[in-house]
Amino acid sequence: MSHELTDKKRAALNRLKTARGHLDGIIRMLESDAYCVDVMKQLSAVQSSLERANRVMLHNHLETCFSAAVLDGRGQAAIDELIDAVKFTPALTGPQAQLGGAVVCKPPGDQPAQSPA
Protein backbone atom coordinates (compact mmCIF):
# COMPACT_ATOMS: atom_id res chain seq x y z
CA MET A 1 0.00 0.00 0.00
CA SER A 2 1.32 3.40 -0.99
CA HIS A 3 2.14 5.97 1.69
CA GLU A 4 1.50 8.87 -0.69
CA LEU A 5 -1.89 10.51 -0.30
CA THR A 6 -4.29 10.25 -3.22
CA ASP A 7 -6.14 13.38 -4.32
CA LYS A 8 -9.27 12.06 -2.63
CA LYS A 9 -7.47 11.38 0.67
CA ARG A 10 -5.99 14.86 0.52
CA ALA A 11 -9.50 16.27 -0.06
CA ALA A 12 -10.85 14.30 2.91
CA LEU A 13 -7.96 15.51 5.06
CA ASN A 14 -8.71 19.12 4.12
CA ARG A 15 -12.40 18.63 4.96
CA LEU A 16 -11.47 17.16 8.35
CA LYS A 17 -9.12 20.04 9.14
CA THR A 18 -11.89 22.48 8.25
CA ALA A 19 -14.35 20.54 10.43
CA ARG A 20 -11.85 20.62 13.31
CA GLY A 21 -11.70 24.41 13.07
CA HIS A 22 -15.48 24.56 12.86
CA LEU A 23 -15.74 22.39 16.01
CA ASP A 24 -13.40 24.75 17.84
CA GLY A 25 -15.77 27.57 16.92
CA ILE A 26 -18.76 25.61 18.22
CA ILE A 27 -16.94 24.97 21.49
CA ARG A 28 -16.37 28.71 21.82
CA MET A 29 -20.07 29.26 21.11
CA LEU A 30 -21.02 26.91 23.93
CA GLU A 31 -18.48 28.45 26.29
CA SER A 32 -20.03 31.86 25.64
CA ASP A 33 -23.56 30.48 26.16
CA ALA A 34 -24.68 30.95 22.54
CA TYR A 35 -28.29 30.37 21.54
CA CYS A 36 -28.99 26.61 21.38
CA VAL A 37 -30.51 26.69 17.88
CA ASP A 38 -27.45 28.48 16.52
CA VAL A 39 -25.21 25.81 18.05
CA MET A 40 -27.41 23.04 16.64
CA LYS A 41 -27.17 24.53 13.14
CA GLN A 42 -23.40 24.64 13.37
CA LEU A 43 -23.27 21.06 14.66
CA SER A 44 -25.37 19.96 11.67
CA ALA A 45 -22.95 21.71 9.35
CA VAL A 46 -19.98 19.87 10.89
CA GLN A 47 -21.85 16.58 10.72
CA SER A 48 -22.52 17.14 7.01
CA SER A 49 -18.86 17.92 6.45
CA LEU A 50 -17.84 14.68 8.19
CA GLU A 51 -20.34 12.71 6.10
CA ARG A 52 -18.90 14.23 2.91
CA ALA A 53 -15.39 13.30 4.04
CA ASN A 54 -16.60 9.76 4.66
CA ARG A 55 -18.10 9.57 1.14
CA VAL A 56 -14.82 10.82 -0.32
CA MET A 57 -12.97 8.11 1.60
CA LEU A 58 -15.44 5.49 0.36
CA HIS A 59 -14.85 6.54 -3.24
CA ASN A 60 -11.09 6.48 -2.66
CA HIS A 61 -11.30 2.99 -1.15
CA LEU A 62 -13.41 1.70 -4.06
CA GLU A 63 -10.97 3.11 -6.62
CA THR A 64 -7.84 1.82 -4.89
CA CYS A 65 -7.82 -0.91 -2.23
CA PHE A 66 -11.20 -2.44 -3.09
CA SER A 67 -10.59 -2.70 -6.82
CA ALA A 68 -7.11 -4.14 -6.19
CA ALA A 69 -8.60 -6.77 -3.86
CA VAL A 70 -11.20 -7.77 -6.46
CA LEU A 71 -8.54 -8.05 -9.17
CA ASP A 72 -6.41 -10.17 -6.82
CA GLY A 73 -9.27 -12.61 -6.22
CA ARG A 74 -10.11 -11.31 -2.74
CA GLY A 75 -13.45 -9.80 -3.75
CA GLN A 76 -15.67 -11.43 -1.14
CA ALA A 77 -13.31 -10.49 1.70
CA ALA A 78 -13.22 -6.90 0.38
CA ILE A 79 -17.02 -6.80 0.20
CA ASP A 80 -17.36 -8.14 3.75
CA GLU A 81 -14.84 -5.60 5.03
CA LEU A 82 -16.63 -2.75 3.26
CA ILE A 83 -20.04 -3.79 4.58
CA ASP A 84 -18.62 -3.90 8.09
CA ALA A 85 -17.07 -0.44 7.64
CA VAL A 86 -20.26 1.28 6.46
CA LYS A 87 -22.97 -0.57 8.40
CA PHE A 88 -23.18 2.13 11.08
CA THR A 89 -23.06 5.03 8.62
CA PRO A 90 -26.66 6.00 7.80
CA ALA A 91 -25.50 8.68 5.35
CA LEU A 92 -23.99 5.89 3.24
CA THR A 93 -26.45 3.06 3.89
CA GLY A 94 -29.75 4.59 4.96
CA PRO A 95 -32.89 4.61 2.81
CA GLN A 96 -32.05 8.04 1.34
CA ALA A 97 -28.33 7.35 0.87
CA GLN A 98 -26.73 8.64 -2.30
CA LEU A 99 -23.26 7.89 -3.57
CA GLY A 100 -22.32 10.34 -6.26
CA GLY A 101 -25.95 10.74 -7.30
CA ALA A 102 -26.77 7.03 -7.47
CA VAL A 103 -29.34 5.82 -4.97
CA VAL A 104 -28.14 2.81 -3.02
CA CYS A 105 -30.17 -0.22 -4.10
CA LYS A 106 -32.05 -2.46 -1.71
CA PRO A 107 -30.79 -6.03 -1.35
CA PRO A 108 -32.69 -8.55 -3.54
CA GLY A 109 -34.55 -9.96 -0.51
CA ASP A 110 -36.07 -6.53 0.19
CA GLN A 111 -37.81 -6.30 -3.18
CA PRO A 112 -41.61 -6.68 -3.22
CA ALA A 113 -42.84 -9.96 -4.66
CA GLN A 114 -43.91 -9.69 -8.28
CA SER A 115 -47.17 -11.25 -9.39
CA PRO A 116 -46.88 -13.92 -12.09
CA ALA A 117 -47.65 -12.65 -15.58
From Swiss-Prot:
| InterPro entries for this protein | Metal_Tscrpt_repr (IPR003735), Metal_Tscrpt_repr_sf (IPR038390)
UniProt keyword terms in alphabetical order: Copper, Cytoplasm, DNA-binding, Metal-binding, Repressor, Transcription, Transcription regulation
Record bears the keyword Hydrolase = no
Q: Where are the transmembrane segments?
A: none
Please state where this protein is localized.
Answer: Cytoplasm
> Which residues does the annotation say bind Cu cation?
C36, H61, C65
Domain topic, free-text comment: This protein has an antiparallel four-helix bundle architecture that represents a novel DNA-binding fold.
What's its job? Copper-sensitive repressor that has a key role in copper homeostasis. It is part of the cso operon involved in the cellular response to increasing concentrations of copper inside the bacterium, which can be highly toxic. In the presence of copper, CsoR fully dissociates from the promoter in the cso operon, leading to the transcription of its genes. Binds to a GC-rich pseudopallindromic sequence, 5'-GTAGCCCACCCCCAGTGGGGTGGGA-3', in the cso promoter region.
Complexes and interactors: Homodimer.
> What is this protein called in UniProt?
Copper-sensing transcriptional repressor CsoR
Species: Mycobacterium ulcerans (strain Agy99)
